[in-house]
Amino acid sequence: MSFLQKFRKFAMRGNVVDLAVGIIIGAAFGKIVSSLVANVIMPQLGLLIGGIDFKQFSWVLKPAQGDTPAVVMKYGIFLQNIFDFIIVAFAVFCIIKLINRNASQRGGKTRRAVQTECGRDAAYRDPRSLETTKQRHGAGYNDD
């Protein structure tokens, strides 16, 4: 099998395609969250604090001299990015909680629940996982 055929086989596997779709959707979701923070949350927060625009928060480390621009640390934009991260992290947390709750309502077990019950990292009692575990922990390992 040639290199290009191997690459095509790799690229067309379900996991790679799913990962690509997830990254694209994640990037679009990140833009939505950034817009929400910059255009909805931060202006309201600034209004509550007293009409402050967080994007303008900065420290001048070295003032401008002639044609040389000032050296400025814009920590207001950093604060906005922290809010972006918190909102994305919260959204991901809520989605994972929803998925886990739906799995438990259907009577299915999540991978983490199975791993916890087994007391080891052999997921779903798959023989391949057991072989991997034996290789990791030594030949004397048994699955009782």
Curated annotation (Swiss-Prot):
Lineage: Bacteria, Pseudomonadati, Pseudomonadota, Gammaproteobacteria, Enterobacterales
One Pfam family in the UniProt entry: MscL
Name of the protein in its database record: Large-conductance mechanosensitive channel
Chain spans, region Disordered: 105-144
GO molecular function: mechanosensitive monoatomic ion channel activity
The organism of origin for this protein: Sodalis glossinidius (strain morsitans)
Chief location category: membrane
Entry's Gene Ontology cellular component terms: plasma membrane
Biased composition (Basic and acidic residues): 118-134
Entry's transmembrane regions: 21-41, 76-96
Highest taxon in the source lineage: Bacteria
Its job: Channel that opens in response to stretch forces in the membrane lipid bilayer. May participate in the regulation of osmotic pressure changes within the cell.
InterPro entries per the UniProt record, alphabetical: Mechanosensitive_channel_CS, MS_channel, MSC/AndL, MscL_channel
Membrane topology of the entry: Multi-pass membrane protein
Family: Belongs to the MscL family.
Cellular compartment(s): Cell inner membrane
Complex formation: Homopentamer.
Keywords from the named record: Cell inner membrane, Cell membrane, Ion channel, Ion transport, Membrane, Transmembrane, Transmembrane helix, Transport
